[in-house]
Amino acid sequence: MLNFNIFLVGPMGSGKTTIGRYLARITGKNFYDSDREIESRTGVSIPVIFEIEGESGFRQRECKIIAELVQLNNIVLATGGGAVLAAENRRELSQRGIVVYLYAPPKQLYRRTSHDNNRPLLRTGNPLERLKCLLKERDPLYREVADVIIKTGKQPVKAVANEVLRQLRQYKGGAPQRKSFVHVKSNKGA
């Protein structure tokens, strides 16, 4: 049994919510998505929060939610793509669980997010270029906070989740060896 919280970080479209839900189901943990928690508590969507409060207002809400959620036990938490921008979030995540960075190349992120209108940072003339810029800015922060880095791509959710679990099980009874990098090979049958 995995007796620690699992926190997923990575860019928008990397699969944090989808993989997080699956991980929670197969580990018996409770699943939380920090963005959905913010929407649930405010009663409005992330784009509306960005429109009214700007990104800085949203980030303040995000810090409060993450500080609260990391206090829970037996959870899988999918964070927002920009959660790592705040040093306090990185500190809280590192101290309260195992952090898994789900990495995907920008073109893959673009394919996954291109039809999603709920991403205010991609409301630009060139969303692919914006994704590249965001990843360039945030990748060092994801890597700083990560205990494990899993490169995703076109792999099925089950294959990625199973690789995350395989890596996490190595930590049973002890602290992880930080910065393991794993590339999950595509497995069509998984």
From Swiss-Prot:
<keyword id="KW-0479">Metal-binding</keyword>
<dbReference type="InterPro" id="IPR031322">
    <property type="entry name" value="Shikimate/glucono_kinase"/>
</dbReference>
<dbReference type="GO" id="GO:0008652">
    <property type="term" value="P:amino acid biosynthetic process"/>
</dbReference>
<dbReference type="InterPro" id="IPR000623">
    <property type="entry name" value="Shikimate_kinase/TSH1"/>
</dbReference>
<keyword id="KW-0028">Amino-acid biosynthesis</keyword>
<dbReference type="GO" id="GO:0004765">
    <property type="term" value="F:shikimate kinase activity"/>
</dbReference>
<feature type="binding site">
    <location>
        <begin position="13"/>
        <end position="18"/>
    </location>
    <ligand>
        <name>ATP</name>
    </ligand>
</feature>
<feature type="binding site">
    <location>
        <position position="35"/>
    </location>
    <ligand>
        <name>substrate</name>
    </ligand>
</feature>
<feature type="binding site">
    <location>
        <position position="81"/>
    </location>
    <ligand>
        <name>substrate</name>
    </ligand>
</feature>
<keyword id="KW-0057">Aromatic amino acid biosynthesis</keyword>
<feature type="binding site">
    <location>
        <position position="119"/>
    </location>
    <ligand>
        <name>ATP</name>
    </ligand>
</feature>
<dbReference type="GO" id="GO:0009423">
    <property type="term" value="P:chorismate biosynthetic process"/>
</dbReference>
<comment type="function">
    <text>Catalyzes the specific phosphorylation of the 3-hydroxyl group of shikimic acid using ATP as a cosubstrate.</text>
</comment>
<keyword id="KW-0067">ATP-binding</keyword>
<protein>
    <recommendedName>
        <fullName>Shikimate kinase</fullName>
        <ecNumber>2.7.1.71</ecNumber>
    </recommendedName>
</protein>
<comment type="subunit">
    <text>Monomer.</text>
</comment>
<feature type="binding site">
    <location>
        <position position="17"/>
    </location>
    <ligand>
        <name>Mg(2+)</name>
    </ligand>
</feature>
<dbReference type="InterPro" id="IPR027417">
    <property type="entry name" value="P-loop_NTPase"/>
</dbReference>
<comment type="similarity">
    <text>Belongs to the shikimate kinase family.</text>
</comment>
<dbReference type="Pfam" id="PF01202">
    <property type="entry name" value="SKI"/>
</dbReference>
<keyword id="KW-0460">Magnesium</keyword>
<keyword id="KW-0808">Transferase</keyword>
<dbReference type="GO" id="GO:0005829">
    <property type="term" value="C:cytosol"/>
</dbReference>
<dbReference type="GO" id="GO:0009073">
    <property type="term" value="P:aromatic amino acid family biosynthetic process"/>
</dbReference>
<dbReference type="GO" id="GO:0000287">
    <property type="term" value="F:magnesium ion binding"/>
</dbReference>
<keyword id="KW-0963">Cytoplasm</keyword>
<feature type="binding site">
    <location>
        <position position="59"/>
    </location>
    <ligand>
        <name>substrate</name>
    </ligand>
</feature>
<dbReference type="InterPro" id="IPR023000">
    <property type="entry name" value="Shikimate_kinase_CS"/>
</dbReference>
<dbReference type="GO" id="GO:0005524">
    <property type="term" value="F:ATP binding"/>
</dbReference>
<keyword id="KW-0418">Kinase</keyword>
<comment type="pathway">
    <text>Metabolic intermediate biosynthesis; chorismate biosynthesis; chorismate from D-erythrose 4-phosphate and phosphoenolpyruvate: step 5/7.</text>
</comment>
<keyword id="KW-0547">Nucleotide-binding</keyword>
<feature type="binding site">
    <location>
        <position position="138"/>
    </location>
    <ligand>
        <name>substrate</name>
    </ligand>
</feature>
<feature type="binding site">
    <location>
        <position position="155"/>
    </location>
    <ligand>
        <name>ATP</name>
    </ligand>
</feature>
